[in-house]
Design a protein with these regions (language model features):
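Extracellular/periplasmic solute-recognition and catalytic clefts
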Residues: 3-5, 32-33, 45-119, 145, ...
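Structural transition elements
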Residues: 157-205, 227-236
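Short, well-ordered beta-strand elements
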Residues: 4-5, 41-47, 217-228, 252
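Gly/Pro-rich hinge or "lid" segments in bacterial periplasmic/extracellular proteins
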Residues: 1-45, 51-54, 195-196, 200-201, ...
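Cytoplasmic C-terminal tails of single-pass
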Residues: 422-432
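Extracytoplasmic/peripheral linker and loop segments enriched in polar/acidic and small residues
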Residues: 94-96, 103, 127, 132-136, ...
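Alpha-helical transmembrane segments
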Residues: 405-420
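Long beta-strand-rich cores associated with HINT superfamily self-processing modules
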Residues: 358-394
Length: 432
């Protein structure tokens, strides 16, 4: 069905609008309805649009209050349109479109398989040190800040660890949360470590200039990807190849469909891979368990896709599970994050942006992945909606007038030609 209608339940008990929020919510007007009973809307009408172009057009014209309620990428797309065109920026600004943005509580990263002899743990203490330095060098070379500039629809804030902002225990966005392996602080600013530092680590790992110091053979790594390449995906894969090439490392792309990719992950045959995680509850444990040894994907069919196994990390994770939020829990989380930063089991990637798109007559709109019943918070000004729709869609009368004039001209020309033909004699002469 292309149309779904939800109406207010007259027997619903009601629920008060929240009185607390995140920093900045009050200034954004998101707490103005504090204590009022929800929902504020009597009817919700959903129209299914198969194509993105007409959906965007209807929103721009004012015929949609929001493009989609649960999706959080349309705000990013409208913001990019504004950045690409002064005309569009002026139009969207004049119409008062609201495009609030936040950092999503999900992450994307490049992982290294702990079971792999080259990028994994290593069989001997000496090999463990070399493999760790190789992972650290690669983590420096993969420039996630550049990724977000080149692929802004998919990018976000560079991750320094496994925990996105907004969770207890996360230090994302602070100087205390900087990953010392990949970044450093210069004049109060966070900057990525240089390629020279990465190359020095690579040499210490036994691969000077990307070649095995014992055999002289070039280092070739395999990148397992979870989709068959499309033109868009190919550009991302090419970008990743270039990141490894900075260190003179050859990266072979092994892109497959998702079923084959999952099979590799379960068997533990991947080497370097791309993965992500969307939390289902807002707690640090929901991310830190992704690196807990007994959750290994290959060994126990868990969600530890890197098959990471560090006794010091696991010991702290078992402590964390029983702790309430507080200084002691923060200390344990800091220690766990520091362990995985040093081991560089992930190149931590990025936390994507979530951004909604709302008309100026829509109030209390805030993008969220964790909260799915966002519509009950919305408040609408229907009088403003009607006025803006009329203002933005005034009929243009000159096209039909032009058509009428063209028809009159064509009719006059046809009539003149007909009369001239009627006055021709047999020799083609026009009679008076």
């Amino acid at each position: 069905d292309r149309r779904h209608v939800l109406e207010r339940n007259p027997n619903y008990r009601g629920e008060p609008y929240p009185g607390e929020g995140m920093p900045g919510d009050k200034e954004a007007g998101l707490l103005a309805d504090c204590g009022k009973m929800m929902p504020f809307i009597d009817k919700l009408v959903f129209n299914a649009e198969k194509e993105a172009v007409p959906l965007k057009a209807k929103f721009i014209q004012g015929y949609l209050d929001v493009p989609e309620i649960e999706r959080t990428e349309y705000g990013v797309e409208f913001a990019l349109d504004m950045a690409d065109s002064d005309r569009v920026r002026k139009e969207y600004t004049a119409r008062g479109f609201k495009l609030p943005r936040t950092v999503d509580i999900s992450n994307w990263y490049v992982g290294f398989n702990w079971l792999d002899p080259v990028v994994g743990k290593g069989a001997t203490p000496e090999q463990q040190v070399r493999n760790r330095k190789l992972r650290q060098a690669l983590s420096i070379a993969i420039d996630w800040e550049e990724y977000s500039r080149i692929f802004p629809k998919k990018g976000g804030e560079t991750a320094m660890g496994p925990l996105p902002g907004g969770l207890f225990g996360s230090r994302h966005g602070t100087l205390a949360g900087v990953n010392p392996v990949t970044h450093r602080i210069v004049d109060g600013k966070i900057v990525r470590r240089s390629l020279d530092e990465a190359k020095a680590l690579l040499a210490e790992a036994g691969y000077p200039n990307g070649r095995d110091e014992k055999t002289g053979r070039p280092l070739v790594l395999n990148y397992d990807y979870q989709r068959v390449p499309t033109p868009e995906i190919k550009s991302e894969l090419d970008w990743m190849v270039k990141q490894f090439a900075k260190l003179d490392i050859q990266l072979e792309i092994r892109a497959t469909d998702y079923n084959q990719f999952q099979d590799k992950m379960r068997k533990g045959t991947q080497q370097v891979f791309f993965w992500g995680w969307l939390a289902d509850y807002p707690d640090a444990e929901n991310y830190l368990f992704l690196l807990y040894g007994p959750n290994s994907k290959a060994r126990f069919d868990g969600e530890n896709t890197a098959n990471y196994d560090n006794p010091e990390y696991d010991k702290r994770y078992n402590m964390l599970r029983l702790m309430d939020d507080g200084p002691a829990k923060q200390k344990v989380i800091d220690e766990m994050v520091a362990i995985v930063q040093q081991d560089a089991i992930w190149s931590f990637g990025w936390f994507p942006y979530a951004s909604g798109a709302y008309q100026p007559w829509v109030y209390n709109g805030k993008p969220s992945i964790m909260i799915r019943d966002m519509a009950k918070y919305y408040r609408i000004d229907p009088a403003m909606r009607v006025a803006k729709q009329a203002e933005w869609n005034r009929p243009s009368w000159w096209p039909p007038l032009l058509i009428v004039l063209m028809l009159i001209g064509a009719g006059w020309g046809t009539q003149r030609a007909f009369r001239k033909r009627e006055r021709l004699n047999a020799r083609g002469e026009v009679l008076a």
